[in-house]
Amino acid sequence: MDKFRVYGQSRLSGSVNISGAKNAALPILFAAILATEPVKLTNVPELKDIETTLNILRQLGVIANRDETGAVLLDASNINHFTAPYELVKTMRASIWALAPLVARFHQAQVSLPGGCSIGARPVDLHISGLEKLGADIVLEEGYVKAQVSDRLVGTRIVIEKVSVGATLSIMMAATLAKGTTVIENAAREPEIVDTADFLNKMGAKITGAGSDHITTEGVERLTGCEHSIVPDRIETGTFLIAAAISGGRVVCQNTKADTLDAVIDKLREAGAQVDVTENSITLDMLGNRPKAVNIRTAPHPGFPTDMQAQFTLLNMVAEGTSIITETIFENRFMHIPELIRMGGKAEIEGNTAVCHGVEQLSGTEVIATDLRASISLVLAGCIATGETIVDRIYHIDRGYEHIEDKLRALGAKIERFSRSDEA
């Protein structure tokens, strides 16, 4: 199992090219199941979760390959299996997105109950209830979600009980091939939903309202091929902005979209950063200063993203002052805090709230990554701490950050990957 060794007290500065968004690429890859013709996707990041998804698609009978330019080519015209097995699904919660397009196009699907990050309860209930309202018969048997429908799904009005990105995407995908009109109320509004809707519309779907809490889909009989470029990763962008903010540095994030990060940019400016934006870049300059503490409350988009909470927790641990962080989206999402405390941070956790007391300096030690975003906060902490930090279980990071050590090195970080066998 790989680890990172990080030598600290680096000021992180320079330019970084932002990858395509994992959280858009994954649903779009699964949505390609709906197409009867080949699909070409560009700006798809090279990540563990992407490779897992491609393997699931191949298991179903999709021809899925990358060409010499890195584009992903998909042909789902000859799908002949309708089961996503446990051995592939177990590592990734997003694999539940195979269910809706299979049921919508082939009227049957079996998807193993998924795995992934250990961030509290992320039930698939909302996916299931949405598909049931469209007419699917669903049972849970032997660890599998089994769905079928005798004919096409039928459009209806669906009010999602709790705002859910995953369920919004599942219902929207299924509705593209349903008879009649489907209206999703209380839909999630994330940019990745907009990107998925744009992709589906290029294939011939009739979706309006994506990006609002009211999405309308007119069902069509079939979807065709298209080309699509994945939207830039707003969470990777925010992570590199934090890297400069906590180290007194200056970073230019290229190939990104500032309008997907308004809540994050507002908080960075509140923390004392100078932030300038163009159509496809964001520049953050801390001018060598220590950040000021900022209160954070996570919320569905356009609120503050839960996937940036761990990075801002780190910022607050080295900032001037005391801050309160409230996590409203997921339970059990403060697992990075005990590790940061081991590095000299000061914080108390009570329920879904953490109170951080900024310290001037963290100290390197050995820490364990527990989930994707917690992991990257520990790596960034190592970049600014004194001495050496070892980050274990970095497979979490490989699930969501493309070429992370190369990008950090380009900004001046002293970081290397090694395995336990190297230590022997």
From Swiss-Prot:
Active-site annotation: 117 (proton donor)
SUPFAM superfamilies reported in the protein's UniProt record: EPT/RTPC-like
EC number in record: 2.5.1.7
Subcellular localization: Cytoplasm
Disulfide bond residue pairs: none
A GO CC term assigned to this protein in UniProt: cytoplasm
PTM sites of type 2-(S-cysteinyl)pyruvic acid O-phosphothioketal: 117
GO MF, any single term: UDP-N-acetylglucosamine 1-carboxyvinyltransferase activity
Binding site for UDP-N-acetyl-alpha-D-glucosamine: 93, 122-126, 162-165, 307, 329
Catalysis performed (reactions): phosphoenolpyruvate + UDP-N-acetyl-alpha-D-glucosamine = UDP-N-acetyl-3-O-(1-carboxyvinyl)-alpha-D-glucosamine + phosphate
Binding-site residues for phosphoenolpyruvate, renumbered to this chain: 22-23
Signal sequence interval, chain numbering: none
Function: Cell wall formation. Adds enolpyruvyl to UDP-N-acetylglucosamine.
Name of the protein this chain belongs to: UDP-N-acetylglucosamine 1-carboxyvinyltransferase
Originating organism: Haemophilus influenzae (strain 86-028NP)
Chain's gene name: murA
